[in-house]
Amino acid sequence: MLMKAQTDKSLLLLKECLQKEVMMNAKSFSWPRVIHKAIKCPRRRYYFWWRIASYWYQNKTGFLKQAALRINRKLTLKYGTEIELGARIMPGLVISHHQGIVINGSAVIGHSFRIRQNTTIGITGSNPSKLPISIRIGNNVSIGANSCIIADQIIIGDNVVIGAMSFINKDLPDNSNVITEKTLRITVRETEPQDLKSVSDS
């Protein structure tokens, strides 16, 4: 009975995700409408297939779970986006550009999450403290391009904006704007590089 209730809850969540990310309108949910949008709108197909694969992976066994893994491998190859199926992402996911996105399977991410190209949400790989992996990101979080969130345990609050080219390895409070300060350094060479000089001489 408990397992059935959990499955029903997961199915309702799946439908809400597809409503917001694939249908993207106020019409009532129906599978024909979702499938029609997935076929008609190529930019929405990733959301459709990843949500289906995620649901199968987390709620099914045997053939469907293996099918979910195959679907996700194909999505990774086609879109250059690797979101592990263990990741739990609430409705409203927005991927501005797909290339180079990686999200670890331990991530738990809230509603209306926006992520951009060449961004990684991952773990250190060493975990010297041996504590359980926990990557938690709140609601209404936006991450700029070319950013990295790397930690074995981290909490990012609600309504956080992370600027492009940021490195995050510490907790962030609610309602914060975060950037990693960068310094542009330009030096003028005193001599012409050897490889360019040899080309000009020839």
List each language-model region with its residue ranges:
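Right-handed parallel beta-helix
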Residues: N127-K130
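Terminal amphipathic alpha-helical/low-complexity segments used for targeting or macromolecular assembly
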Residues: M1-Y79, E190-S202
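Left-handed beta-helix
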Residues: Y79, L85, M90-P91, S96-G105, ...
